[in-house]
Amino acid sequence: MSPLSTSAPGVRQAAFRFRCIACGTLNDSASQDFRCAHCGDLLEITYPRWKEASPDAAKLKSTWRNRRLSSEPIDQSGVWRFRDLLPALESDEQAITLGEGNTPLYELPQCARITGVPRLFAKHQGLNPTGSFKDAGMTVAATFARLAGFRWVACASTGNTSASMAAYAARGGLRSLVLVPDGKISWSKLSQALDYGAVTCQLRTDFDGCLRLLQQLVLRAPVYQLNSINPFRLEGQKTLALELLEQLDWQPPDHIIVPGGNLGNSSAIGKALGEMHGLGLISRLPKLSVIQAEGANALVRTLREAGGKRLISVQAETRATAVRIGNPASWKKAVNVLEATSGACEQVTEIEIAQAKAEIGAEGIGCEPASAVTLAGLKKLLKQGFVKPEESVILVLTGNLLKDPDFTLGFHRGDLFRGTPDESASARLDPWRRPPIVLDATLDAVIRTLEQAEKS
């Protein structure tokens, strides 16, 4: 019996409803744009029967730990392993899974020395099946798309969402439609969507334009939206926090720092923290902070210029393409999370992102540029005194190093910032560059290079 069951055998407490984040209206169903029928705001999934279930936190933890020893596919998923806190399935076989989740928590000794924060860790979501955190949400959302009877799923994307959606659609026997901004996403991400069979449309607009078109499309065609506006996506993504706390033996860190793009991930993690605290799984809430690229800083400006009351959209421009979003859909949810956890929101420059990415790479784990905003942001939060050196800090790395090889090669070759206003400032990055060395194919040439490297 599930630890969230009532006395009746087999009764699951993951029965859910859709709740508007603005007016609080509850509904048993949602329209295809996942907007409140009364006020037009975003929806979230809530579980009203949890309060009457009197959950046993110790049994939940034991159940989740024991499932890791199971050979069942659903238990091998680091998302569905926590299915007691997810929307219920009638049978485990309904889940579309690629074995997502169960990602590592790394110590960062070199970055710890650089920042002066000894207890510094990275939760690396880039080691999911398609190389990003999106897989944790997509396994749930794609599953419910198929259960709802849809043949087609669709998304607007800066790259990671399209790769993930296309993979899970293929796995679940669904067709997928991808809308991406032409020339503004990494080719490695685009190639994933192509290989997984997506119908891929490169639109002459930015991500925000792609998302606007998608929201019109789902109201006119039998297509299921799989962007993070879809609350099923966030239910899957919230398991990152459950898995993280399990890895920490349910002892909350002082800080969790997350990249900020469309803001669904920070919203999902914040939702999970609130639910865990309410269920007695953790004793206190960590501070969750969101870091944005300076050129895609809609949430930063929303908080500073409008007090978090209205969105200040921006024309996004950053080399960290995964967060190149100027009109984030989940901004209200993110504001609520920052308030609930007493978190911070900060922005970092392109140079700061590039340096932080190199520093993470020197740990032997690597990440895509958007993930590196977390380390760059930590440095700023330390200078401001918001983070204390003696506190524990988790950096959420959302994407794999291989997601954006052009950035990495450009950085090490020294031409990433060539011809830009940042070119002169980028000289400070020289100690971190490791350009490829072209040599004659002789032993002496290789030995001389080795000797020179030994001196550096």
Language model: regions and residue ranges:
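PLP-dependent amino-acid enzyme catalytic core
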Residues: 2-456
